[in-house]
Amino acid sequence: MNSHRGSSLLEAALVVPIVLALLVGTVQLGRIIYTYTMIEKIMLNLARYLGTQQGVNFCDSQDPSVQAAINFALTPSTDSAADSIVANLTADMFQIQIQRYDSNAQQLVACDCSATGCDTSQGGLPPGFIVVSLTDGYTVNPIFWGFRMNAFPLRPSVKVPYGGT
């Protein structure tokens, strides 16, 4: 009976670090998934806001409607006075593309900015879809037991139909 004395303490000393490592890893994974989901929701709000606006010039990235949509997605208002919902996510990180269905190729293709394309200021037709993505992604730096892991970018992308004119 004396030979088993202290074995529970030894087992606990061996198992507790492993359980703690799994717990910390789960928390970091949850943080990354939460960040990805929040960025995806922000991009979906941006695309939906743009998809319901009238007279948006998608060929001009400085169009007031485009800028208002980006600010509305990042902050709770259409001006850029408030802080972003996700830290270090800025307006210049968003890439907005317009697409239209090509019946010859039978697929969605990027809509060019011309009178025959989707440039409404030159008399072009509106796009069929709005695609919002991040130009270089959103870099996350996971920390595991005080050690920084290799940083990697999150690259969500959202596509919604365009309902404006």
What role is predicted for each listed range?
Residues S8, A12-V27:
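Alpha-helical hydrophobic helix detector
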Residues Y36, L44-T165:
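Short, conserved structural patches
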Residues Q28-E40:
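Membrane-proximal amphipathic alpha-helices
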Residues V24-V27, R31, A47-G51:
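Short amphipathic alpha-helical interface segments enriched in basic and hydrophobic/aromatic residues
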Residues M1-R5:
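N-terminal leader/signal peptides at the extreme start of proteins
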